């Protein structure tokens, strides 16, 4: 049986006057009240040892729905008090959660369900997408600057936002799930992402450069840029393109280090000679674990 999604629901049931509830529901509510202390025990001092039958169920579901933790999550924390169990943690698969709840119920467990399915729509206030907002952002295993780096994101790259906890937990276009510092992306709604994707872009073609506040390299810089960065094309002025960032900032980038995306795509060559020439152009760029940008490149 599935009882409460969180403690607050249980607390609400306890403090609500009985006069509010129809008499025919009082007996069932009384039964629920009797179970609340059991879940409280499971929450605070519950046994974290997972019974073999539950471990087997969890392992089978993880293999089915999240075999590669880099691209799918099934991180469940269990707290037991006899046949009562509280579930905490996160998963990216609603199917996996349903299968877990069904499996536990069939084995006779009463479940307090606090397992969260990502993306966290409510916590993100509808902004379940994002756009990389800096030249290169580092994506990490955990929400900490000392955590191992998984990969990198380039300015203009769309991502799926799964969770916010100081940092953002995101999923990249190639399905990697990682944490990024909040300044690295600009959260948007689905509609805002569609507008960004449909806008004409300017692509940075040089390994490194800058966007300026005015169409002059003597003006204040807005930010740096790196090869492969995408900016919204707002117009042209002399030797510069006027561009906009995902967060709305504007500036000017030299035509000598960038070009319209459509033109860039038309000139791409994917033959062996062109790929080797591009690789040679990056000789001397520093090695960086999980680096995928012109600021630092991994060996792979």
Question: What do the predicted segments below correspond to?
Answer:
Residues 1-45:
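Bacterial Sec-dependent N-terminal signal peptides
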Residues 47, 51, 55, 63-72, ...:
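N-terminal capping segments
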Residues 71-101, 167, 241:
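Short glycine/threonine-rich beta-strand-turn micro-motifs
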Residues 77-82, 101-105, 112, 116-129, ...:
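Beta-strand-rich, non-transmembrane domain signature
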Residues 86, 97, 150-182, 221-255:
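SH3/SH3-like beta-barrel superfamily modules
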Residues 102-122, 172-203, 216, 221, ...:
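Boundary regions of SH3-family modules and the immediately adjacent low-complexity/disordered segments
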Residues 126, 130-133, 197-200, 205:
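A short, polar/charged loop/turn motif at coil->beta-strand junctions and beta-hairpin connectors
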Residues 132-158, 204-233, 287:
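Beta-loop motif signature
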